[in-house]
Amino acid sequence: MNNTDTKIIKVHGKNIDNFFQNIITNDINNLNTENPLYTAMLSPQGKYLYDFFILKEENFFLLEANANKVNSLIDEIKRYDIRKDISIELQENFYTKVIIKESLVKDY
């Protein structure tokens, strides 16, 4: 993500874990409630479309994506929701903070 202006998307619904496992490049099983994963979506031909961070909460996911591309990312996710089992909400009142652990700062 080159642009530092990001937006947060909340995605929830039936079989949401399996849904994301089938449309992102990273393994959803590596995701937990403590640390986000950096991942991407590709076209069926393998062409890069979007990259974002994904964080799992108890029964939903939060995606942090480039603000300039967030609406088209939402549209792309909706294309894969054939059964209309998921809900996607742009979180207008959410914002991003970066916190770096002291142990990581010492390495730089």
What is each model feature region?
Residues 1-108:
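Basic, glycine/lysine-rich polyanion-binding surfaces/domains
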